[in-house]
């Protein structure tokens, strides 16, 4: 094993934990995704081990690591912390270095982040009060329909007669879905209707600039959402190679910039120590 510095980004969401390992040339050389569960620290350690093995690297070669996301303060090996808004923006701008709007559909929340042509944040909106339009919403609906979550994208693509749902609310939508089943509506048509609900919920949050990027685990596992969004917006959307990893990649990019100096960024963007 050749010794060389590597940089680690850890994004602990309420649903999934993601780790990205970059080399000094900012190339992604290792990554892993797992359920966050009820022990964020253990999830981070597990993903780190898998990521380092993929990168053919050891813990001793980690020059710096930054944590982000809901559980960022539960990562014992992190040398610094950054907010998820900063890291998602950083990760997306790495792949699309121009003025962009970012749609991030996560397990428990949705985010829209706007960056200027220099990568500076010019605005953002986040939906944290309700699970509607998130991965948790689709997970609940898949349980109601008694179908595996991973099969929803394929089913939506089979739809020939979309069934629109009248409610964004997870609780009311569950009742409405059961009623549609009772009426004899086909499952693929209902699933496509659920996808439409997710898209409408996100797009109503904020207006978007011409170059729009879609990221998040929901996008990674349900690429048909991107196709439907493009049809609704009437233009092509940008999707990074690893849409679920943008936050972790952004954190690793900050690790490259910051080095081993500890830094804890607060929610308002201020730092206890200079990054």
Describe each PLM feature range.
Residues 3-42, 46, 121-129:
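Short glycine-rich, Thr/Ser-proximal phosphate-binding strand/loop in the N-terminal lobe
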Residues 84-144:
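Glycine-rich phosphate-binding loop of actin/hexokinase-like ATP-binding domains
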Residues 70, 203-232, 243-244:
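Glycine-rich phosphate-binding loops at beta-strand->alpha-helix junctions
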Residues 84-85, 230-249:
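Conserved phosphate-binding/catalytic loops in two-lobed NTP-binding clefts
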Residues 138, 240-275:
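Glycine-rich phosphate-binding/hydrolytic loop that grips phosphoryl groups
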Residues 40, 118-161, 165-166, 253:
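Glycine-rich phosphate-binding loop plus the immediately following alpha-helix
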């Amino acid at each position: 094993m050749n010794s060389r510095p590597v940089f680690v980004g850890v994004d602990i969401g309420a649903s999934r934990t993601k780790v990205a390992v970059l080399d000094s040339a900012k190339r992604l050389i290792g990554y892993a995704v797992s359920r966050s569960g009820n022990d964020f620290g253990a999830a981070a350690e597990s993903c780190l081990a898998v990521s380092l093995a993929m990168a053919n690297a050891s813990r001793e070669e980690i020059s710096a690591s930054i944590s982000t996301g809901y559980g960022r303060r539960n990562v014992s090996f992190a040398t610094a912390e950054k907010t998820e808004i900063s890291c998602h923006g950083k990760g997306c701008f790495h792949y699309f270095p121009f003025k962009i709007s970012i749609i991030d559909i996560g397990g428990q929340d949705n985010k829209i982040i706007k960056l200027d042509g220099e990568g500076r944040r010019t605005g953002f909106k986040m939906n944290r009060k309700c699970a509607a339009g998130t991965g948790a919403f689709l997970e609940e609906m898949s349980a109601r329909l008694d179908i595996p979550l991973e099969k929803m994208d394929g089913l939506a693509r089979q739809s020939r007669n979309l069934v629109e749902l009248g409610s964004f609310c997870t609780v009311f939508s569950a009742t409405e879905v059961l009623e549609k089943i009772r009426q004899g509506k086909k499952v693929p048509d209902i699933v496509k209707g659920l996808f439409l609900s997710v898209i409408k919920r996100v797009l109503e949050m904020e207006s978007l600039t011409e170059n729009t990027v879609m990221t998040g685990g929901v996008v990674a596992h349900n690429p048909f959402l991107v196709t439907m969004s493009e049809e609704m917006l009437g233009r092509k959307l940008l999707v990074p190679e690893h849409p679920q990893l943008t936050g972790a990649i952004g954190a690793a990019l900050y690790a490259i910039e910051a080095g081993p100096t500890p830094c804890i960024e607060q929610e308002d963007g201020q730092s206890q120590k200079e990054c």
